[in-house]
A protein has these predicted regions:
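A short, surface-exposed loop/turn module that caps and links secondary-structure elements
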Residues: 28-54
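Enriched for short, Lys/Arg-rich terminal
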Residues: 1-5, 16-20, 24, 50-81
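Short amphipathic alpha-helical/adjacent loop interface patches that line ligand
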Residues: 11, 15, 26, 30
Length: 81
């Protein structure tokens, strides 16, 4: 079962191309996380971890919530150029 993606940030102010790429990237993360076995040591490190990824000039901070099978994007900021 694939992880669902939830954005706790407003993506509307982001240009359409970057917004599309952000959604696509986070969905890819959700798809990959769904393939990790429940017995993997990866999950014990995810309990309190914040992760980040940079996409087209934007930094996203997210959590993996295995009990809910969710990826939650909790922060978004423009990177300085």
């Amino acid at each position: 079962m694939t992880y669902s993606v939830h954005f706790e940030v407003n993506l509307e102010a982001i240009p359409e191309g970057a917004r599309h790429e952000i959604r696509r990237t986070v969905q890819q993360i959700a798809d990959v996380v769904s393939t990790i076995p429940g017995s993997s040591p990866f999950w014990s490190s995810m309990k309190e971890s914040l992760l980040q990824v940079d996409v087209q000039g934007w930094r996203l901070v997210y959590r993996v919530l295995p009990d809910r099978r969710e990826i939650r994007v909790i922060e978004l900021e423009a990177l300085r150029r």
